[in-house]
A protein has these predicted regions:
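Short proline/glycine-enriched turn/loop motifs at strand-loop junctions of beta-rich domains
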Residues: 196-199, 344, 350-352, 436, ...
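Hydrophobic beta-strand core residues of beta-sandwich domains
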Residues: 178-182, 186, 271, 324, ...
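Extended, solvent-exposed regions of the mature portions of secreted/cell-surface glycoproteins
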Residues: 205-276, 282-417
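Glycine-centered loop/turn positions within well-structured domains
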Residues: 121, 317-319, 365, 438, ...
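Extracellular calcium-associated, cysteine-rich motifs in secreted modular proteins
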Residues: 415-481
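Acidic glycine-/aspartate-rich tracts in secreted/extracellular proteins
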Residues: 47-50, 100-102, 127-129, 209-210, ...
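Short, solvent-exposed loop/edge segments of extracellular or virion-exposed proteins
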Residues: 173-179, 322-329, 431-434, 467-470, ...
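Extracellular (secreted or membrane-anchored) zinc-dependent metallopeptidases
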Residues: 1-282, 289-304
């Protein structure tokens, strides 16, 4: 309906946000359009003060309720219009279609609050939640929980005219539940096929909403010891069917847990307490907004998901590498030893008897198998081979039949033997490979030469701050100051 005369505009005098929707719009649509001629009603307002209200949740097709929503924003500004489209119109329309909020700013007792802080998907409050902002603006997609809520309302509605969709639904492969040790990273992987051969896009989204009347997961209490609620944010769909928790870049830095995050934080953490983490593997056969070059049709896309449970136990963990925590040299043809803390993962409940060790030549792509199906006993000795040669290696230990993992913290250089520092000591025997020290002095006997040892006396205090760097004095006692 186009209003051609200003005098006929029923909204011209409704300058307050609380009067933009509700009865004026409902009355206008029912009189001018007719109740039987529309399924949902929504009015747009051009204003410098963005706002919105759905007037209901799940009211499509509902007489006297379905036409009460408004979205307001600066429609003349291309940047703000994008915000209007996603953060306001799609958000309020989502409410009309039956979706609740997914953010955790307060406990709304809906079971849909599966994203920490402000959330980042359409039904969250990204960008308007202060310290609780996960990011500045919402991403242009609905959380799988929102999709499920909307589909339930749409399916139950009485007014839609249903049309067949030629596009077949993707088929998700078998997924398994796992028990993992506390304070340990893990890796989620799923598979799916499409009967039509469509390009598939994937997400892993957590599906833990706080219990009614209990906590909310805000920046103040987001931590690895949460006993309920989400511990990981939603990430945009991509062609990758896997997700590391936390993200691999954090794992490589040894930052497995996160507390009190802000807008530039990852909002991802491992769990240090016993709990069940529910995850959904979400598969879509259409990209967001821009079609892929291989997509030749513009038909309706499908979204499907399947759930898994990751049980975190207090009886094991943390599973972690205990060797190669700092820069290390491995020499081709020489023996090397890797060690790790089994941390009762070989016992019930985790029951990991055998592990694989994977090596990354580039420090992050773990495609080379260093050892396969070896005992989970905390140690492995092998001979370095030429195909491992690299200046930036790392390794990952993970069970043969589980999803948790651990990565060493230091860079590994693999090379043939030589004498890098020219001090007359071959590198494989030199206790300070990069700095000349022909005397091989090692005061604390830790295998690291004094000239490159950050703690010469081995008392746990760095040389730079140790008030007696060559004599162990852990308490740093200094009676005369």
């Amino acid at each position: 309906t186009i209003i051609k005369n200003r005098k006929d505009d029923p909204f011209r005098n409704n300058m307050r946000a609380e009067t933009w929707n509700g009865d004026p719009l409902q009355k206008f649509l029912d009189e001018k359009v007719g109740d039987a001629n529309y399924d949902v009603g929504h009015v747009f307002h051009h204003t410098k003060q963005p706002n919105g209200n759905a007037g209901c949740i799940g009211c499509i097709c509902e007489k006297g309720e379905k036409g009460r929503a408004f979205s307001a924003g600066d429609l003349s500004n291309s940047v703000e219009k994008d915000v209007f489209d996603i953060d306001f119109f799609c958000h309020e329309l989502g409410h009309q279609m039956g979706a609740n909020h997914v953010h955790n700013l307060n406990n709304e007792n809906t079971g849909a609050q599966v994203e920490p802080g402000s959330g980042s998907t359409i039904m969250g409050y990204a960008g308007i939640s202060g310290a609780n902002n996960v990011q500045r603006r919402s991403d242009p997609y609905f959380n799988h929980v929102s999709v499920e809520q909307m589909m339930k309302h749409i399916t139950a509605a009485t007014c839609p005219v249903k049309a067949p969709i030629a596009n077949s639904v993707p088929v998700i492969g078998e997924l398994n539940d796992y028990t993992i040790p506390r304070s340990t990273a893990y890796h989620l992987v799923g598979t799916a096929t499409d009967p039509d051969g469509d390009i598939l896009y994937y997400m892993w989204e957590q599906h833990n909403s706080p219990q009614p009347g209990r906590i909310t997961v805000t920046s103040d209490n987001f931590a690895d010891n949460l006993t309920e609620g989400p511990m990981a944010r939603s990430l945009r769909p991509s062609r990758s069917n896997e997700r590391y928790i936390p993200r691999l870049s954090q794992i490589l830095e040894g930052k497995l847990s996160e507390r009190n995050p802000g807008p530039t934080s990852t909002w991802e953490t491992v769990s240090s307490v016993k709990r069940t983490l529910k995850w959904a593997f979400v598969v879509m056969d259409k990209s967001l907004g821009r079609r892929d070059d291989r997509e030749t049709d513009v038909s309706t896309g499908n979204t499907v998901y399947a759930g898994v449970k990751i049980n975190v136990t207090n009886n094991a963990g943390p599973f972690e590498v205990t060797s190669q925590a700092r820069k290390t040299y491995w020499f081709v043809g020489k023996t090397c030893t890797i060690t790790w803390n089994v941390a009762d993962t070989d016992k019930q409940e985790v029951n990991t008897q055998r592990v694989n060790i994977l090596f990354a030549l580039d420090g992050q792509t773990f495609t080379h198998t260093l050892a396969a199906n070896i005992p989970n006993n905390g140690s492995y000795t092998f001979t370095a081979t030429a195909d491992l040669t690299t200046s930036n290696g790392r390794f990952m230990i993970r069970p043969v039949d589980n999803i948790y993992l651990a990565v060493n913290l230091g860079k590994i250089i693999v090379k043939t033997d030589g004498d890098i520092d020219g001090d007359g000591i071959v590198d494989s025997l030199d206790n300070c490979i990069e700095t000349p020290n022909p005397d091989q002095a090692d005061l604390d006997g830790d295998g690291i030469g004094d000239v490159c040892d950050e703690d010469i006396d081995g008392d746990g205090v760095n040389n730079a701050t140790d008030n007696c760097a060559r004599i162990p004095n852990t308490n740093q006692k200094d009676t005369d100051k």
